[in-house]
């Protein structure tokens, strides 16, 4: 039976509240302390080796120099579902999306071992790639507890403009999940049209390296410092 909108919203609040108040060991560090710190990066471009990939590579190379491992998952070019608000991920306590025919749950499986996250996307009409938004929204609903409280950053790549709006759109889910946003010397933006052209954006590449160093520093700083205990989410609506 399909979950009503009110039931779905209440379930979301309950899951978020639980994640916010549960012990850190359950969600933020579901691995041994002596393992190497790791950042999970998601390439949201339909071009596997385009400018988004080039920006993420700059981040990965810098993280490696700082002693932090990384893994990049490409969302690919196959159709990706959007969230249909069925609520089964929550009502059945699945911890994953009920639909298992695209990359969403493959990413979910990687969340627990990640100490930080980086999302990268090209800019389409001032927004991130729709496929990335679709998959990440489902992941946040189904497995947001495994993202909760971990450092996160987003990268927007564009030919000319619209990247700041895309950048903000990608940041917003992390802001709802109590994730410290990793900043840089500028917004995490790179410019380029043809594949690889972003490498010529000297300031953009420097921005990626600075963000990566900040990410490594923050992950290491938080390793043995659990977040504060959070109050349960007091969810209200404009219409009762």
What are these regions (language model features)?
Residues 1-15:
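N-terminal secretory signal peptides and thylakoid transit peptides that target proteins
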Residues 23-49:
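C-terminal segment of N-terminal export signals and the immediately downstream linker at the start
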Residues 37, 98-186:
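Helix-loop-strand module that forms the ligand-binding subsite of alpha/beta enzymes
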Residues 58-68:
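A short, Lys/Arg-enriched amphipathic alpha-helix followed by its capping loop at the start of a domain
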Residues 69-78:
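A short beta-strand-loop structural module common to alpha/beta enzyme folds
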Residues 78-111:
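Cysteine-cluster motifs in flexible loop/terminal segments that predominantly coordinate metals
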Residues 180-240:
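Glycine-rich phosphate/pyrophosphate-binding loop and the adjoining helix
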């Amino acid at each position: 039976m399909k979950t009503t909108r009110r039931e779905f919203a209440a379930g979301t609040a309950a899951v978020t509240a639980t994640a916010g108040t549960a012990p850190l060991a359950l969600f933020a560090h579901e691995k041994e302390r002596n393992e190497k710190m790791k950042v999970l990066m998601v390439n949201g471009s339909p071009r596997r080796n385009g400018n988004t990939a080039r920006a993420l590579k700059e981040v990965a190379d810098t993280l490696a120099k700082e002693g932090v491992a990384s893994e990049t998952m490409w969302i690919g070019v196959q159709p990706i579902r959007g969230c249909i608000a069925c609520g089964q991920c929550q009502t059945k306590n699945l911890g994953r999306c009920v639909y298992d025919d695209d990359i969403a749950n493959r990413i979910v499986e990687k969340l627990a071992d990640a100490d930080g996250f980086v999302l990268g996307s090209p800019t389409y009409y001032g927004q991130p790639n729709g496929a990335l938004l679709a998959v990440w929204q489902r992941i946040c609903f189904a497995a947001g507890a495994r993202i909760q409280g971990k450092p996160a950053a987003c990268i927007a790549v564009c030919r000319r403009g619209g990247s700041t709006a895309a950048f903000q759109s990608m940041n917003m889910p992390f802001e709802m999940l109590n994730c410290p946003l990793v900043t840089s010397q500028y917004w995490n933006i790179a410019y380029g049209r043809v594949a690889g052209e972003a490498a010529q954006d000297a300031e953009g590449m420097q921005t990626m390296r600075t963000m990566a160093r900040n990410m490594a520093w923050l992950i290491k700083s938080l390793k043995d410092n659990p977040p504060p205990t959070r109050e349960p989410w007091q969810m209200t609506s404009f219409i009762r």
